[in-house]
């Protein structure tokens, strides 16, 4: 499939990977709806497209994102969920507030967004499109990591949700894709909800990770495990 001319919603578009998706998809000619909690950060992207401001964990905001795409472009052909939050430390150090936030941002937000987007994605398929919905569970969904147990858990749940929901939604012509790259050099680990990041080895390039994912979307791939990113730097 070609992504040129397709209407794509990017949730978390001002984060490390979200920003890279916005830049690369804009260069490919996609029609973007850029969703973020921060209007100033969204404005600083300098990327053409519709803007949707709001916290994805709040009621009605995922629907607002989708409606913005429909109002601007008349259709929705793809959704990328790049929102995320991380925390570090032994399980005994986590507060309920941090545990709840990890679930809300990483997992529940995607569930709500996909629910809101499904009718529009199904309409795209009915009109001959090849709609997709992309999540980014990361390598911790394959290899849960000590010191990141709650984060590993919510990302594993994100992956499992995608597998099951993908079996449902393929009947409507919607392709769900989950990407599980290894540690990537974004700023996510510099701003944890709790704890401090360990000394990770050098991570993958966000540019190359996103290039690989976009290639997979264009090629019709349905799953991008960590092995898909082997050899990237």
Each predicted region: which residue ranges?
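Conserved glycine-rich cofactor-binding loop
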Residues: 14-15
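C-terminal helical subdomain
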Residues: 178-179, 194-233
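Substrate-binding pocket helix/loop in short-chain dehydrogenase/reductase
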Residues: 90-91, 98-103
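Active-site helix of classical SDR
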Residues: 114, 154
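Conserved glycine-rich Rossmann-like NAD(P)H-binding loop of the short-chain dehydrogenase/reductase
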Residues: 28-44
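Residue(s) in the substrate-gating loop at a strand-loop-helix junction
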Residues: 135-138
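Active-site loop immediately N-terminal to the catalytic Tyr-X3-Lys motif
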Residues: 145-149
């Amino acid at each position: 499939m070609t992504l040129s001319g397709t209407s794509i919603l990017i949730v978390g578009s001002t984060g490390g990977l979200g920003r890279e998706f916005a830049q690369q998809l804009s260069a490919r000619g996609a029609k973007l709806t850029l969703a973020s909690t921060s209007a100033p950060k969204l404005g600083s992207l300098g990327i053409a497209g519709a803007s949707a401001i709001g916290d994805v964990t709040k009621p009605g905001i995922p629907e607002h994102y989708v409606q913005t795409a429909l109002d601007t472009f008349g259709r929705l052909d793809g959704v990328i969920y790049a929102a995320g939050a991380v925390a570090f430390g032994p399980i005994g150090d986590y507060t309920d507030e941090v545990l709840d936030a990890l679930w809300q941002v990483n997992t529940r937000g995607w569930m709500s967004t996909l629910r809101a987007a499904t009718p529009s994605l199904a309409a795209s398929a009915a009109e001959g499109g090849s709609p997709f919905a992309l999540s980014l569970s990361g390598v911790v969904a394959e290899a849960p990591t000590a010191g990141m147990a709650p984060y590993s858990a919510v990302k594993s749940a994100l992956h499992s949700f995608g597998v099951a929901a993908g079996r449902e939604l393929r009947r409507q012509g919607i392709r769900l894709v989950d990407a599980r790259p290894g540690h990537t050099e974004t700023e996510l680990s510099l701003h944890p909800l709790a704890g401090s990041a360990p000394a990770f080895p050098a991570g993958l390039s966000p540019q190359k990770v996103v290039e690989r994912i976009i290639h997979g979307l264009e090629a019709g791939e349905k799953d991008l495990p960590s092995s898909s990113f082997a050899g990237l730097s």
